[in-house]
A protein has these predicted regions:
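Basic/aromatic-rich interaction segments and small domains that mediate binding to polyanionic partners
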Residues: 7-62
């Protein structure tokens, strides 16, 4: 996935090795995009109902 790809409504997965390991492999839906495409942050509504902010590089297309 490239930084221009994620958009609201897209399903993503947290990459393994995330610094908060409880999120490893969780799926969610992109709610909002923030910042410059080279330093993109994404609000993701996770499958457990939590809204969490991730850096682009911490996610992959599900």
């Amino acid at each position: 996935m490239q930084s221009h790809e994620p958009h609201p409504g897209m399903t993503v997965r947290v990459k393994a090795g995330h610094w908060k390991s409880k999120f490893d492999g969780m799926r969610g839906t992109v709610e909002h995009r923030w910042g410059h495409p080279h330093h993109l942050a994404l609000d993701v509504l996770l499958e457990d109902g939590r809204l969490q902010l991730f850096w682009f590089h911490e996610l992959e297309k599900a």
